[in-house]
Amino acid sequence: MSTRTEELRAIPLLAGLDLLALEKLAAGTSELEARAGQPLTHPGATGTGMFFVVEGTVEVEAPEGVRELGPGEFFGELALLTDKGKRTARVRAKTPVRCIAVDRATFETLLKDHPDVAAELLEAGLGRLD
């Protein structure tokens, strides 16, 4: 099992996926590293992927407030779940951070193949809009 697959398996949202599904997902990912203070997304930008935090902390500034996300958490999914495909939040690295980036095509395949993950993502996304 690759390191990337192991990192994905540690993410609570993906914990129910079998090894084959995790390896397929890992093949469609890349790594994003950022230094503290570096912006990662900004409102209005077109969302081309979502991100799972592996190391470090990010700060999310959204219309509903500011929150921090750490290892095992994710951001950027709302832009992929809506027709508009636009980012709704400003995200910056609060500490040095390493994320796994999932592109739109891989994300859409994941949702199609695993409706349970799609439901959890939708629930999480809607919860963030409250």
Question: What are the roles of these predicted feature ranges?
Answer:
Residues R4, L19-K24, G85-R90, R98, ...:
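A small-molecule sensor/coupling module
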Residues M1-E31, R35, L80, D113-H114, ...:
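Cyclic nucleotide-binding regulatory module and flanking cytosolic helices
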